[in-house]
Design a protein with these regions (language model features):
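Extracellular beta-sheet repeat scaffolds used for adhesion and glycan interaction
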Residues: 1-13, 235-237
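An edge-strand/N-cap motif at the start of beta-rich repeat modules
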Residues: 49-80, 85-88, 106, 415-416, ...
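Conserved core positions of repeat-based scaffolds
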Residues: 57, 94-97, 106, 143-146, ...
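Acidic, Ser/Thr/Gly/Pro-rich low-complexity segments and short DxT(G/T)-type signature motifs
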Residues: 18, 25-51
Length: 432
């Protein structure tokens, strides 16, 4: 509930159906005026209003991942057919997206069975995944982890590191349920070999590769190189929701409900944000979670060897590897130097501005929206990732044309292998 001047607004905690009638009620005494007098409990009837949402895509398209029914590359946005899209998650050259009717659609590279359609076939336009009870899908390298509305966990596609969580390395091209638990509420699949997930009780679970201690189990000596079933990390206050979990092939990060941010794994380029970094010869590792300073962290998304995160005050921060300018600091280093290891930043550095809203990342590219509906991008741009109609890398934010881009973290939901995403392409939502 939000109160502003003489207006009171209520925000649903879950999506509203466009076909249902809802009744809103509150008991007597719950709401009072400034004199302390209670308003009489009452009820209101309303129908949710669903606006049209369009998907726009650009970048690499070798597997049809832009949904254009072709394999042509685009360095400026092109629309994917349809106006009832709700949100999107990307993987390595493929995508899954939800529509308003809760159907899920796939397009792009179907290698390793990534489509979940019982085939290793690529699709250059959206095709439907069976079922309407999916609530969360997150993607990594040619594979997916998903949660249904009943709290069950599912997986399919690439599984060489045990990322299904079913205690096997078998790869399947259609969804398989992982265990019998019905309390999963968020899942984050990243890189080629790791998954993190939370349950409704606030616990955090991880599985997959453990080579760099990125599972946070206080094991970094290689004794156990991978876990193919979920293992719990200490604590019961881990946050869930869009962009609360992050990571890449060698490190992980997560936000707690108190706004603190924690990281673990490899720290070669300062990606753990602890104001210390290793060198090529002696990389520093932390095999259990360590806190990054601050208590107002809101969302986080990882690039290849670094992180991008927002705070509750609308500021945007970046740290780690900066070879392509992905930290937004107006500097980059295409060649290493002895005194400046790819211009890495081992502690959070602020990107100018205080109205940043949602974030998404690829391997070395960053996208972000502001509260005014503008959309910005920077970093790697070889395949037109920045949608600025050229392929020059940018080390500070550049605006993508338009002011009607959807704000809120669900707009650029996950760019996995990044966040909602792939390494070389982007899908974004407009509201019409």
């Amino acid at each position: 509930v939000t109160i502003s001047d003489n207006s009171l607004s209520m925000t649903p905690t879950s999506d509203l159906s466009e076909t249902k009638i809802y009744h809103l009620s509150y008991p007597s005494g719950v709401i009072t005026n400034m004199a302390g007098e209670s308003y009489v409990g009452t009820a209101y009837t309303f129908k949710s209003i669903v606006v049209n949402r369009e998907f726009w895509a650009w970048g690499k398209n070798n597997k049809g991942q832009l949904g254009q029914n072709n394999t042509t590359y685009y360095s400026s946005p092109v629309q994917i057919p349809g106006t009832t899209w709700k949100n999107v998650s990307f993987g390595t050259n493929f995508n899954f997206a939800f529509k308003n009717d809760n159907t899920v659609w796939f397009w792009g590279d179907g290698g390793y069975g990534a489509s979940g359609l019982n085939a290793e076939v690529s699709y250059s336009s959206p095709v439907q995944l069976p079922g309407t009870t999916w609530s969360r899908i997150d993607l990594g390298y040619h594979g997916a982890s998903a949660i249904k509305t009943d709290g069950t966990l599912w997986a399919w596609g690439y599984n060489a590191q045990g990322t299904y969580g079913d205690n096997s390395l078998t790869e399947l091209s259609s969804p398989i349920q992982i265990g019998s638990d019905t309390t999963w509420n968020d899942v984050n699949k990243y890189g080629t070999g790791n998954v993190s997930a939370t349950k409704t009780d606030g616990t955090l679970w991880m599985w997959g590769s453990n080579d760099e201690g990125m599972l946070g189990l206080n094991q970094s000596d290689g004794t156990v190189s991978k876990y193919s079933s979920p293992v719990q990390l200490p604590g019961t206050t881990w946050a869930s929701g869009n962009k609360k979990l992050a990571g890449w092939n060698s490190f992980s990060a997560a936000i707690k409900t108190d706004g603190t941010l924690w990281a673990w794994g490899r720290n070669r380029f300062g990606q753990l944000g602890l104001n210390q970094a290793g060198s090529p010869a002696t990389p520093v590792r932390y095999s259990s979670p360590v806190q990054i300073p601050g208590t107002t962290w809101k969302n986080i998304s990882s690039v290849q060897y670094g992180n991008i995160a927002t705070k509750t005050d609308g500021t945007l921060w970046a740290w780690g590897w900066n070879y392509w300018g992905q930290l937004g600091q107006n500097e980059h280093s295409y060649e290493p130097s002895p005194d400046n290891w790819f211009k890495s930043k081992s502690s959070p550095c602020q990107i100018p501005g205080t109205t940043w809203d949602a974030i998404a990342t690829g391997a070395n590219t960053v996208w972000a929206t502001k509260t005014d509906g503008t959309f910005w991008a920077w970093g790697y741009n070889t395949f037109g990732n920045l949608a600025n109609n050229n392929r020059a890398h940018m080390s500070s934010p550049v605006q993508i044309p338009g002011t009607d881009w959807i704000t809120g973290q669900s707009a650029i939901d996950r760019w996995k292998n990044g966040g909602s995403s792939s390494v070389y392409h982007t899908v974004m939502i407009k509201e019409t």
